[in-house]
Amino acid sequence: MKLDQVARSLLLKEFVSGFFLAMKYFLKPKATINYPFEMGHRGPRFRGEHALRRYPNGEERCIACKLCEAICPAQAITIEAGPRRNDGTRRTTRYDIDMVKCIYCGMCQEACPVDAIVEGPNFEFSVETREELLYDKQKLLENGDRWEREIARNIAIDAPYR
């Protein structure tokens, strides 16, 4: 037994096997991405910054049903509905999301019957003050207008599974 230990220490078997293992991984392509310059793949169900969508004619989709407000586990959504219009529909006068409270669970998006509130593809929305994370209706509509093409594509891809 002692002779075996002496042979291993003289031949540095562990060192050589570790060196070859390191060289094996050293020569493989890198698994990481250079983040600010390269963007990783985001799937169609990615939950990023919230957005309110519009119909192609420019009218907002939200019908003030308040399902998203009711289902939000963090109670981050506040909606106030205006009076009924001549055609019997309602629209929101106030639609606020407190992004500090939001846990990005996606339940608001799942509850919406008209796909008005969605969690878009944007995840880079750092701010300097907490007040900037209180999204009002105008900010949410701007997000929807900015990301509409990608949001519509992601919803179309995900449609068979909904």
Curated annotation (Swiss-Prot):
Binds 2 [4Fe-4S] clusters per subunit. [4Fe-4S] cluster 1 binds at residues 62, 65, 68, 112. Its cofactor is [4Fe-4S] cluster. Keywords: 4Fe-4S, Cell inner membrane, Cell membrane, Iron, Iron-sulfur, Membrane, Metal-binding, NAD, Quinone, Repeat, Translocase, Ubiquinone. It is found in: Cell inner membrane. Residues 52-82, 93-122 form the 4Fe-4S ferredoxin-type domain. SUPFAM superfamilies: 4Fe-4S ferredoxins. GO terms for cellular component: plasma membrane. [4Fe-4S] cluster 2 binds at residues 72, 102, 105, 108. It is a peripheral membrane protein. One of its GO terms (biological process) is aerobic respiration. It catalyses: a quinone + NADH + 5 H(+)(in) = a quinol + NAD(+) + 4 H(+)(out). Its EC number is 7.1.1.-. One of its GO terms (molecular function) is iron ion binding. PANTHER family: NADH DEHYDROGENASE [UBIQUINONE] IRON-SULFUR PROTEIN 8, MITOCHONDRIAL (PTHR10849:SF20), NADH DEHYDROGENASE UBIQUINONE IRON-SULFUR PROTEIN 8, MITOCHONDRIAL (PTHR10849). NDH-1 is composed of 14 different subunits. Subunits NuoA, H, J, K, L, M, N constitute the membrane sector of the complex. NDH-1 shuttles electrons from NADH, via FMN and iron-sulfur (Fe-S) centers, to quinones in the respiratory chain. The immediate electron acceptor for the enzyme in this species is believed to be ubiquinone. Couples the redox reaction to proton translocation (for every two electrons transferred, four hydrogen ions are translocated across the cytoplasmic membrane), and thus conserves the redox energy in a proton gradient. Belongs to the complex I 23 kDa subunit family. This is NADH-quinone oxidoreductase subunit I.
